[in-house]
């Protein structure tokens, strides 16, 4: 079997010294077909599908903006419940400090969520999807920095894979790209930074429900003054337990109500803010003058800096604007923030500041104290509902991130259940759900007040925002057409502000600030260990792949039985024959009548059209009916159930055989193994049409497939009736004998402990046990 690509040491296709530079321009156009058995060339024949970035009408945009209010802005919208109490933990000594803090809140909200995220970060999306993984995937597609060496040149021909390369500053970008690709340390650091950010966001799935529900329920003290803080925490815990227990039902059926509830919440807090402003002190509007920030720090010094740990809570949930972008679009998120959230929360804070100028002693319960008596109970009910919705959004976000991490080989196997037929990103993970529930209950029971939880929450919020700043800076340098001046200003202004806030949050490390770091350290260790072994397991298969002549040798063996039916042999290896095949033949001297060696591969892209998913090739000799198949998914794609997957593979295999038969009769002779990409054959690009037209003009009889092709398709159809058997490798990974002590601990004990305590592959794929054959093999890495 002749491989179309030669893999270099870093897993990419070997090219000349100038090829990488030139390839940046060729990603945007389909390379003209040179030969019909070229996987690299044939991958470009399919027209791209529609992405999130496609232009939509204003009616659709406004509808999406309304939906985003309930999904994206619940967390940031509930911040007025606890910001002032978390900032003035020791009370208000000077009422002028209220103006200083109010000014800090105004310009923090304007600088980070509005300017940084709405106008800059949202542009760094991956075909309409956002979040840390989206940024990492953008950088990974532009520069080969993946730690798993399974890149193929044809990956760049996937429609959503294409990037707009910087034309006017391509030399600078190319120089940085080369440095990144040639630096193993940079690849590792970038990966660790990415999983640190994702770990922090997953940790928010613990902290957001705690602080949101606890602060909302705390308002009941205004009506039931006899309740102790412990009893209030108990009520919050009961609500949290119910919240996690209903996660398995998904939010599809009740999600439509999120928007109206959160919008009602914004109307309540904005209206209350206007009421308090005109009733108590309109002078707080002076806080729009940033001079009061300077006065505040001059007056309070170190204590002013420490209070920033509370101020930063006014932008909790900002990252959700970017992370949830895939469900909406950039314009909808921008409208939702600037038209609804921004004026509502600013009015809420201004109203509370006006109230505190008159009643500074009420700072611990500012929100509920400032509500007019007739609106108390309606506001309380809406506040609890809004807190639950904000918590729901972060829990769902944690599930989605873990699902993405698992797909990219960065998280142990867990069962991902899709709870919505409308939104592919809404998933439920039972194991993670109950872990989050236990952690939420424990944190709420131990800390009981929003002040201490806020100390932890602040670190998590700013840490993720700072990492986003670093990754977007890389995108600006390499991918965007951005001048060096703007590139320098972005991390200096936004990164500088975030570091100041982060330093303040770290000051309260011992008062709860350690929580997100402990969560993140544990998650990072699990993710890094799993990915480390995942990478080395792939490299083991790459080093030990079997000779291309192996199948030809099998074909002449007389004692090798051919079993009825079709066998799907799974391997991560995308090039060559995996070592598990000869191991299987040695233990069970038989092979199915049709054998498809399947590699399921995830690209650093959010989604792949079904018509671009399957790549096939023959393994010589053709008459032996052994095929290689690479099945490509994006990190947000839903994997089909076994029955649907089997049907798709077989139908695309038949289509491949038919197309290969047509191509093989053309004047372009096939050499070695024949390769085709399946899908979209009824709508080829002009290059394929030109080639086909030229071929047909020279040889009219080639428009009909050879007779053997129809026999082969009928044979596969017949074997399909005999059933499909899934052959899953059950690899026992151990450290090689000469490995150092630390590696043996990580591989032999830590990794294997994680593997045994998470789900096994067949439980993830739901393959029926009566059609599953597990093939055991030991890998020494």
Swiss-Prot record:
Gene Ontology MF, one: potassium ion transmembrane transporter activity
Family designation: Belongs to the HAK/KUP transporter (TC 2.A.72.3) family.
Lineage: Eukaryota, Viridiplantae, Streptophyta, Embryophyta, Tracheophyta
InterPro entries reported for this sequence: K+_transporter (IPR003855), K_trans_C (IPR053952), K_trans_N (IPR053951)
Function of the molecule: High-affinity potassium transporter. Its potassium transporter activity does not seem to be affected by high sodium and low potassium concentrations in the extracellular environment. Invloved in salt stress tolerance by enhancing root potassium uptake and translocation to the shoot to prevent sodium influx during salt stress. Involved in the positive regulation of disease resistance against the rice grassy stunt virus by promoting potassium transport and increasing endogenous plant potassium.
Extracellular side: 85-100, 209-225, 279-304, 356-381, 448-458, 503-512
Chain spans, region Disordered: 1-24, 681-707
Localisation per UniProt entry: Cell membrane
Catalyzed chemical reaction(s): K(+)(in) = K(+)(out)
The protein, known as: Potassium transporter 5
Induction summary: Induced by potassium starvation. Induced by salt stress. Induced by infection with the rice grassy stunt virus.
Any Pfam family hit: K_trans_C
Xref: NCBIfam families: kup
Entry coiled-coil feature ranges: none
Biological process annotations from GO: positive regulation of response to salt stress; potassium ion transport
Disulfide cross-links: none
């Amino acid at each position: 079997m002749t491989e179309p690509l030669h893999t270099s040491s870093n897993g990419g296709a070997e090219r000349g010294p100038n090829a990488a530079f030139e390839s940046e321009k060729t990603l945007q156009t389909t390379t003209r077909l040179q030969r019909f058995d070229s996987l690299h060339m044939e991958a470009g024949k399919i027209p791209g599908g529609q992405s999130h970035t496609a232009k939509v009408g204003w009616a659709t945009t406004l509808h999406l903006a309304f939906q985003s209010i309930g999904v994206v802005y619940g967390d940031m919208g509930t911040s007025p419940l606890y910001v002032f109490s978390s900032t003035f933990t020791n009370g208000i000594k000077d009422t002028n400090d209220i103006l200083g803090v109010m000014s800090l809140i105004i310009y923090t909200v304007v600088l980070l969520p509005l300017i940084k995220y709405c106008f800059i970060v949202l542009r760094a999306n991956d075909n309409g999807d956002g979040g840390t993984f989206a940024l990492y995937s953008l950088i990974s597609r532009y520069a080969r920095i993946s730690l798993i060496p399974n890149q193929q040149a044809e990956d760049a021909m996937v429609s959503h894979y294409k990037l707009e390369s910087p034309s006017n500053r391509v030399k600078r970008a190319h120089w940085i790209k080369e440095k990144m690709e040639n630096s193993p340390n940079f690849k590792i650091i970038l990966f660790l930074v990415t999983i640190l950010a994702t770990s922090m966001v997953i940790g928010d799935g613990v902290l957001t429900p705690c602080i949101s529900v606890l602060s909302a329920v705390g308002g009941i003290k205004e009506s039931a003054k006899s309740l102790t803080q412990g009893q209030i925490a108990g009520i919050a815990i009961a609500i949290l337990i119910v919240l996690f227990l209903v996660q398995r039902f998904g939010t599809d059926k009740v999600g439509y109500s999120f928007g109206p509830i959160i919008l009602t919440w914004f109307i309540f807090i904005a209206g209350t803010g206007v009421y308090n402003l005109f009733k108590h002190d309109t002078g707080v509007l002076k806080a729009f003058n940033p001079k009061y920030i300077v006065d505040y720090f001059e007056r309070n010094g170190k204590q002013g800096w420490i209070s920033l740990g509370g101020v930063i809570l006014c932008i909790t949930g900002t990252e959700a604007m970017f992370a949830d972008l895939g469900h909406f679009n950039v314009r909808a998120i921008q409208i939702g923030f600037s038209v609804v959230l921004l004026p509502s929360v600013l009015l809420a804070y201004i109203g509370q500041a006006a109230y505190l100028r008159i009643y500074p002693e009420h700072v611990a319960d500012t929100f509920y104290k400032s509500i007019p008596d007739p609106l108390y109970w309606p506001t309380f009910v809406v506040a609890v509902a809004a807190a639950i919705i904000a918590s729901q959004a972060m829990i769902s976000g944690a599930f989605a991130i873990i699902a993405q991490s698992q797909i990219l080989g960065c998280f142990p196997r867990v069962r991902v259940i899709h709870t919505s037929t409308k939104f592919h990103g809404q998933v439920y993970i039972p194991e993670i759900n109950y872990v989050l529930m236990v952690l939420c209950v424990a944190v709420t029971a131990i800390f009981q007040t929003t002040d201490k939880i806020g100390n932890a929450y602040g670190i998590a919020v700013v840490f993720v925002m700072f990492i986003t700043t670093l990754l977007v800076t890389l995108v600006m340098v390499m991918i965007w057409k951005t001048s060096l001046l703007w590139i320098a200003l972005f991390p200096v202004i936004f990164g500088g502000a975030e570091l100041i806030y982060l330093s303040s949050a770290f000051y309260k490390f011992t008062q709860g600030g350690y929580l997100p770091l402990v969560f993140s350290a544990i998650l990072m260790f699990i993710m890094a260990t799993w990915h480390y072994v995942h990478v080395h397991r792939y490299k083991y298969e790459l080093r030990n792949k079997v000779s291309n002549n192996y199948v030809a040798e099998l074909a002449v063996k007389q004692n090798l039985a051919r079993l009825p039916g079709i066998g799907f042999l799974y391997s991560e290896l995308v090039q060559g024959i995996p070592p598990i095949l000869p191991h299987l033949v040695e233990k069970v001297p038989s092979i199915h009548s049709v054998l498809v060696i399947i590699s399921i591969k995830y690209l650093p892209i959010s989604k792949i059209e079904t018509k671009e998913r399957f790549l096939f090739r023959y393994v010589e000799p053709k008459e032996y009916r052994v095929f290689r198949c690479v099945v490509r998914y994006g990190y947000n794609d839903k994997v089909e159930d076994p029955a649907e997957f089997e049907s798709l593979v077989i139908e695309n295999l038949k289509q491949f055989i038919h197309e290969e038969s047509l191509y093989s009769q053309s004047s372009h002779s096939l050499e070695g193994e024949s390769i085709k990409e399946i899908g979209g054959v009824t709508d080829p690009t002009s290059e394929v049409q030109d080639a086909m037209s030229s071929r047909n003009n020279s040889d009219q009889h080639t428009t009909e497939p050879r007779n053997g092709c129809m026999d082969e398709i009928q044979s596969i159809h017949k074997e399909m009736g005999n059933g499909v058997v899934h052959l899953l490798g059950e690899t026992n990974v151990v450290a090689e004998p000469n490995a150092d002590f630390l590696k043996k601990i990580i591989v032999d004990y830590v990794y294997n402990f994680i593997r045994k305590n998470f789900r096994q592959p067949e439980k993830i794929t739901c393959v029926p046990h009566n059609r599953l054959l597990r093939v055991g093999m030991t890998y020494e890495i």
